[in-house]
Swiss-Prot record:
Class of enzymatic activity (EC top level): hydrolase
Organism: Bacillus pumilus (strain SAFR-032)
Protein name: GTP cyclohydrolase 1
Subunit relationships: Toroid-shaped homodecamer, composed of two pentamers of five dimers.
Key words of the record: GTP-binding, Hydrolase, Metal-binding, Nucleotide-binding, One-carbon metabolism, Zinc
Sample GO molecular function, one term: GTP binding
Residues binding Zn(2+), per UniProt: 78, 81, 150
Lineage, top ranks: Bacteria, Bacillati, Bacillota, Bacilli, Bacillales
The EC number(s) this enzyme carries: 3.5.4.16
Length: 189
């Protein structure tokens, strides 16, 4: 993926401001195109990042039981409206063959996938599939819950409504008790 073209974004933001009847040269908006371009560089930084790279750090550990990192806060941008959605990701896996990854790597992978124009469903499945491809665990279960500003600010206007998605692979796809265990841990604070 190429670098974000901030100059092109600045011109586009100026055009949008003009199109909605604003004066992009007035004091409050004068630097807005630059600020938006800088923000887009940050919030879309995942476009240049492969989440699988985070799972290349492996620790040889004889552990083949559940590992769960829950409540990983994230934010992303809805690809349909380019407005934010944000929430928490819960990442669970059962390692296989001594392949345990660092806990921070799970959070970094969530960030890499979220920081791009995105759909919640794709975030969920991309994290799961990246883990399966690189770690070959017995099972992976990802649960993502998020509030979408496209449902809060426009259209149906339902603030507080949360969308929950899940992706289950391996053991979790076939074992209801294993899925229930993860869900019980997620619910407990």
């Amino acid at each position: 993926m190429s670098e974000i073209n901030k100059e092109l974004i600045e011109h586009a933001v100026r055009d949008i401001l003009k199109a909605i009847g604003e004066d992009p040269d007035r004091e409050g908006l004068l630097d807005t195109p630059k600020r938006v371009a800088k923000m887009y560089e940050e919030v879309f930084s995942g476009l240049n990042e492969d989440p699988k790279e985070h799972f290349k750090t492996i620790f040889g550990e004889d552990h083949e039981e559940l590992v769960l990192v829950k409540d990983i806060a994230f934010h992303s941008m809805c690809e349909h409206h380019l407005v934010p959605f944000y929430g928490k990701a819960h990442v669970a896996y059962i390692p296989r063959g001594g392949k345990v990854t660092g806990l921070s790597k799970l959070a970094r992978a969530v960030e890499a996938v979220a920081k791009r124009p995105q759909l919640q469903e794709r975030i969920t499945s991309t994290i799961a599939d990246s883990m399966v491809e690189t770690l070959n665990p017995h099972g992976v279960m990802i649960v993502v819950e998020a509030e979408h500003m496209c449902m809060t600010m426009r259209g149906v206007k339902k603030p507080g409504a949360k969308t929950v998605t899940s992706a289950v692979r391996g053991t979790f796809a076939n074992d209801a008790a294993a899925r229930a265990e993860v869900l019980s841990f997620i619910k407990n604070d």
